[in-house]
């Protein structure tokens, strides 16, 4: 970083997720060291401060005290009754300009509700979408799947906007020069699917600002054929969790099927590097959770089970979105006629 570059400041909900605050604090400190970002930890000072002391960082990291918490099982609307919860205060910091991005693990619905209540939608966007990265058969290539849970019920117009935002994200953040957008469907042919998907297809075909490449069947999501795959939040969430489960099952089957005894140990030794690479490519923690596209601020919703590396990845994702001016580019595109 040179002397002319501005340090990115990111607010992190230290109380969200299964391993808060220990893993959240550790991941945030890793991000500060590796990415050069400035971090603000939001949560119960009584819980967060001892963790910072364990890492000798109590004097160098700001804590914003937020005494209330939102549990994993609570309804999203509970955030209205908990204005001092860590997730609401995290979003407040972005709204007030005290942070440029927010990162939160834990209750996805509550995080999205807090972002909408505090930050609001981008002008022209009817519904936000959560985008998640999945690995593909092509080494180094990822596919952006959205929506993965922000809207269980959707409309054709929403899917059209998801496609536009996803294409812009793929182009400017992921570096795909000519992204191909697919619509998740039960067949490749035009006219396939339910009314929602069929109507969305016709809208996407006619939209000159969306690089629409046609329907995407479930088997093609992770082949690398598409750069962006669009669907409603119900289907996207099911698909995302199915993909995560398949990865875990595949690795476990591989371990169980290797020969036992000395031959098995020799085989594992010979394949150690390959197995490590397979695990790394299929590890959801490496992808940092999902970017909440369509809100008037950069918000990353990490997996509820995120540990330190997952939080580091989520913060990296936030920094990439800021560095590549995702919000500005989406706003510019929305000005164009659709």
Swiss-Prot record:
Family: Belongs to the PlsX family.
Protein name (record): Phosphate acyltransferase
Pathway involvement of the protein, from the record: Lipid metabolism; phospholipid metabolism
Example GO biological process: fatty acid biosynthetic process
A GO CC term attached to the entry: cytoplasm
NCBIfam families assigned to the protein according to its UniProt record, in alphabetical order: plsX
HAMAP family from the UniProt entry: PlsX (MF_00019)
GO molecular function: phosphate:acyl-[acyl carrier protein] acyltransferase activity
Job description of the protein: Catalyzes the reversible formation of acyl-phosphate (acyl-PO(4)) from acyl-[acyl-carrier-protein] (acyl-ACP). This enzyme utilizes acyl-ACP as fatty acyl donor, but not acyl-CoA.
Enzyme class, first EC level, given as a word: transferase
EC numbers for this chain: 2.3.1.274
Keyword vocabulary terms for this entry: Cytoplasm, Lipid biosynthesis, Lipid metabolism, Phospholipid biosynthesis, Phospholipid metabolism, Transferase
UniProt cross-references to Pfam families, sorted A to Z: FA_synthesis
Highest taxon of the lineage: Bacteria
Cited InterPro entries: FA_synthesis, Phospholipid_synth_PlsX-like
Organism: Gloeobacter violaceus (strain ATCC 29082 / PCC 7421)
Catalytic activity: a fatty acyl-[ACP] + phosphate = an acyl phosphate + holo-[ACP]
Subunit-structure text: Homodimer. Probably interacts with PlsY.
Record's subcellular location: Cytoplasm
């Amino acid at each position: 970083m040179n002397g002319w570059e501005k340090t990115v400041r990111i607010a992190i909900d230290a109380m969200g997720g299964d391993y808060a605050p220990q893993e959240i604090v550790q991941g945030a400190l890793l991000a500060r060291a590796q990415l050069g970002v400035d971090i603000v930890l939001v949560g119960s000072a009584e819980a967060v401060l001892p963790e910072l002391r364990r890492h000798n960082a109590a004097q160098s990291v700001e804590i914003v005290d937020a005494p209330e918490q939102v549990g994993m099982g609570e309804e999203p609307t509970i955030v209205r009754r908990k204005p001092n919860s860590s997730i609401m205060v995290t979003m407040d910091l972005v709204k007030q300009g005290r942070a440029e991005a927010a990162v939160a693990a834990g209750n996805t619905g509550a995080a999205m509700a807090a972002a909408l209540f505090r930050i609001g939608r981008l002008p022209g966007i009817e519904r936000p979408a959560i985008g998640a990265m999945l690995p593909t058969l092509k080494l180094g290539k990822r596919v952006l799947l959205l929506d993965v849970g922000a809207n269980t019920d959707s409309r054709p117009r929403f899917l059209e906007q998801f496609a536009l935002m996803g294409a812009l994200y793929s182009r400017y953040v992921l570096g795909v020069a000519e992204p191909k957008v697919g619509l998740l469907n039960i067949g490749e042919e035009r006219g396939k699917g339910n009314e929602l998907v069929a109507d969305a297809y016709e809208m996407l075909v006619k939209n000159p600002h969306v690089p629409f490449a046609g329907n995407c069947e479930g088997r093609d999501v992770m082949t690398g054929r598409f750069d962006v795959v669009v669907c409603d939040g119900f289907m996207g969430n099911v698909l995302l969790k199915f993909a995560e489960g398949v990865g875990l099952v595949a690795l476990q089957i591989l371990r169980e099927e290797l020969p036992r005894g000395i031959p098995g140990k020799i085989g594992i030794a010979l394949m150690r590097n390959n197995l490590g690479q397979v695990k790394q490519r299929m590890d959801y923690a490496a992808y940092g959770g999902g970017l909440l596209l369509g809100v008037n601020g950069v918000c990353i919703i990490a997996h509820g089970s995120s540990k330190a590396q997952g939080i580091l990845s989520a913060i990296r994702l936030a920094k990439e979105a800021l560095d590549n001016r995702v919000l500005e580019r989406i706003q510019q595109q929305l000005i164009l006629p659709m």
